């Protein structure tokens, strides 16, 4: 839930990234967040994940949040992929026994082969992103926040990612999805929030939201 939300970046004189945003998102909803660059989409997601806090107002979040934002954030380049699974788990507040339970699922999903026991500094950027994605979608989050993360990997891995997201949605979890792919938003989300210059200009049916957004861009 967002209540009278404002956010002003440091050193900003007049610019507000978000202006008087009030929203309620229910458990189990899948919601697309659309808008041009600079509309406030990423700022909103960062507030939900606790990375950023509002200048005024408050954000109430219930449950465990997994964020597919900066997928490689928190990785140690000198540690192996396997060790980074635990490191990332600790950062997310998970216990050893729980990380051990999901370790094999993460490794299988990431498809890194023997590289899982090699230092992450030897990974390509795509391999790091796959590992980050695999960790976040396998921790059984109550709320999954996605910012263009479905563009990770090749065609086969993208399909695998989409199937996993569909599985999470089917299980009754809440999904917030930011994307510039209108088809992607329509496929995943029945509801969409259209942000424009930090304000919510539409909140409702995804097709209406996308039609309004497309019309504004003409």
Write out the residue ranges for each language-model feature:
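Conserved ABC ATPase "signature" region
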Residues: 1-5, 86, 98-115
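H-loop/switch region of ABC-family ATPase nucleotide-binding domains
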Residues: 179-180
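A short, surface-exposed alpha-helical micro-motif characterized by mixed small hydrophobic
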Residues: 185-187
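Conserved ABC ATPase "signature" C-loop
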Residues: 197-198, 213
